[in-house]
């Protein structure tokens, strides 16, 4: 969800309060509770759950193992419920071209870093950085490169963006900020042997108009760019 005008761009970031997280927290809690009750039933010799008679399950080793899995699962589900309750990772990104200020806010865990807030000048932005990891578990992360501060991620690592979605978002943001886009390509076998890949500027948005940028973002694919390893496409 975002609101955008000619000079201001505000994007609301969804945190841990997602439907998928709620489903996983419920499933994990119920499953862990069932394992723990079965293990306790085998120890007490009483049928706390009618579906699993305690006489058919020995406390050693089946009951101990199921109790351990149940306790571990309850800890993990408690962690998930806490992140949902505190809405960790939610916040907003505000780009004000009129005042030349960028504000990035995120909610964290309770404590010193409960409120994570970054504020810097728009002229300090070097580029929009797009990291694409290919392999069995692909990852696409969009971040903003700041002088003397490094890169600040704008998207979560667990967000499943398609190549077209991440390209479109990077192109629109780069055009709004008038900065170039840097693409970092990594593969699993390259990462293990040679580290991360070198950045390549896909195209410079400062030299393109709005119509040209939309046309360029539709035709330039990150996948084809990585396959062919071409030089940066210039306007």
UniProtKB/Swiss-Prot annotation:
In Pfam terms, one family for this protein is Ycf4
Any idea which UniProt keywords this protein has? Chloroplast, Membrane, Photosynthesis, Plastid, Thylakoid, Transmembrane, Transmembrane helix
Give the source's domain of life in one word: Eukaryota
GO biological process terms, alphabetically, are: photosynthesis
Location relative to the cell: Plastid, Chloroplast thylakoid membrane
Q: How does it sit in the membrane?
A: Multi-pass membrane protein
Name the GO cellular-component terms. chloroplast thylakoid membrane; photosystem I
What stretches pass through the bilayer? 21-43, 63-85
- HAMAP family linked: Ycf4 (MF_00437)
What's the family?
Answer: Belongs to the Ycf4 family.
Q: What does this protein do?
A: Seems to be required for the assembly of the photosystem I complex.
Mind telling me what this protein is named? Photosystem I assembly protein Ycf4
Q: Which organism is it from?
A: Amborella trichopoda
